[in-house]
Curated annotation (Swiss-Prot):
InterPro entries per record: aa-tRNA-synth_II, aa-tRNA-synth_II/BPL/LPL, Anticodon-bd, Anticodon-bd_dom_sf, His-tRNA-ligase, HisRS-like_core, HisRS/HisZ, HisRS_anticodon
GO-annotated biological processes: histidyl-tRNA aminoacylation
Source species: Oleidesulfovibrio alaskensis (strain ATCC BAA-1058 / DSM 17464 / G20)
Pfam families xrefs: HGTP_anticodon (PF03129), tRNA-synt_His (PF13393)
Enzyme class: ligase
Annotated keywords: Aminoacyl-tRNA synthetase, ATP-binding, Cytoplasm, Ligase, Nucleotide-binding, Protein biosynthesis
Gene label: hisS
Protein name: Histidine--tRNA ligase
Reaction catalysed by this enzyme: tRNA(His) + L-histidine + ATP = L-histidyl-tRNA(His) + AMP + diphosphate + H(+)
Length: 417
């Protein structure tokens, strides 16, 4: 019988890779809570209709990438391809709009898209999401971007590029659509990819999001959306940029930045890291003022972002800026009658706030020192025959090679030093 194997595009996360994910989540909790955000956990499974109505039926996500299936009552369900739609559903269903004027929420968890697996892009991937619902003022846009940048700085990333654009609103965007359609009609459309030819009719803005090199080349001179935004949208964008400049943030204006989901309006942004290759976007988001009402809720504006955790981990690996935490100790028991004492010593060390392991069987010094080196521990506490007889322990510093024999009571202080 053949071995059971994981599904293509899905990964097992072992330590230390999983430790990096935990580090990012804990850092995110610390940063986001300082801005007044609270954690929300939403289901992985949602009704397919939710994503069709929010993301847009003409997007690649809905057309090609969703894991969708009928349940036993023939209801169409989908494994979430992104988090915002589920947060909006929870916001509406939980009547959060009636409880507070501004709701600030963050989520962690796996998302699912049927794409070609490659470095930084898996079929199951993990995201950190933030959503701010209620304020329509541009200061909310600036704050959430500043919060994102603070989070990225706290996890050890620097030298990233913030790209920003405005997509206008439902009043002024039709004018841009008309100008864009006229431009696209002037091209030799036979040279565009099949998806772009379809998008020309259904949602021309999606053409600007195409990654096919020839399509990007043909649309290089497409009309710029900021030349077609209304006065209100232009003022909104100007205030956002002004706030970022006053905060000392360097950004790049990217008129082609439309994002891959239909619900965005006005501010859109991405953070890119060129060092991780083709999948260079590590975070992105924007404003979605009509999304809540589109899903049957009140007319509540909102803005949010998502970070791809696999891509963040890749960026951290490339920049090598994060030091992986080392275990404080390994209690190495060399004699069988020292196992109970070793267990109690390890518990005392953990009670004092230290982290480490204890051997469950008496093994040779060579074997346990090899384990200590593999674990990259700071100190090894040796319990051999003489230590067991004397009620002492020998502490070996793995960095300097020095060692000293002390009483068991003094062990926590010696390991902490």
């Amino acid at each position: 019988m053949s071995n059971v194997k994981k599904i293509k595009g899905f990964a097992d996360l072992f330590s230390p890779e999983s430790d990096v994910f935990t580090f990012m989540e804990n850092t995110a909790r610390d940063v986001f809570s300082s801005y007044g955000y609270g954690e929300l956990r939403t289901p992985i499974l949602e009704r397919t209709e939710l994503f069709c109505r929010s993301i847009g039926t003409e997007t690649d996500v809905v057309q090609k990438e969703m894991y969708t299936f009928p349940d036993r009552k023939n209801r169409s369900l989908t494994m979430r391809p992104e988090a915002t739609a589920g947060v909006m559903r929870a916001y509406i269903e939980g009547s959060l709009h009636s409880q507070e004027q501004v709701s600030k929420l963050f989520t962690f968890g796996p998302m699912f898209r049927y794409e070609r697996p490659q470095k930084g892009r898996m079929r199951q991937f993990h995201q950190i999401n933030c959503e701010c619902l209620g304020p329509q003022e541009p200061y909310a846009d600036a704050e959430i971007i500043l919060m994102l940048l603070m989070f990225l700085k706290r996890i050890g990333l620097s030298g990233l590029e913030l790209q920003i654009n405005s997509l206008g609103c439902r009043e002024c965007r039709p004018q841009y659509h008309a100008a864009l359609r006229a431009f696209l009609a002037s091209l030799d459309t036979a040279e565009l990819c099949e998806d772009c030819r379809r998008r020309m009719e259904t949602n021309p803005l999606r053409v600007l999001d195409c990654k096919v090199p020839r399509c990007k080349e043909l649309t290089a001179d497409a009309p710029v959306i900021l030349d077609h935004t209304c006065d209100a949208c232009s003022e909104h964008h100007s205030v956002v940029l002004g706030m970022l400049e006053r905060a000392g943030v360097v950004y790049t204006a990217n008129p082609r930045l439309v994002r891959g989901l239909d619900y965005y309006n006005r501010t859109t942004f991405e953070v890119v890291c060129g060092e991780i290759g083709a999948q260079s976007s590590v975070a992105g988001g924007g404003r979605y003022d009509g999304l809540v009402s589109q899903l049957g809720g009140p007319d509540v504006p909102g803005i949010g972002f998502a970070c791809g955790m696999e891509r963040l981990a890749l960026a951290l690996e490339q920049k090598a800026q994060r030091e992986v935490p080392r275990p404080d100790f390994l209690v190495a028991v060399l004699e069988q009658d020292g196992l109970e004492r070793g267990m109690m010593l390890a518990e005392a060390l953990r009670e004092s706030g230290l982290k480490g392991e204890v051997s469950f069987a008496a093994r040779s010094m060579k074997s346990q020192m090899r384990q200590a080196g593999k674990r990259n521990v700071r100190k090894v506490l040796l319990l051999g025959g003489s230590e067991i007889a004397d009620g002492t322990v020998t502490v070996k510093d793995m960095d300097t090679g020095g060692q000293t024999t002390i009483s068991l009571d003094a062990a926590p202080g010696a390991v902490a030093d």
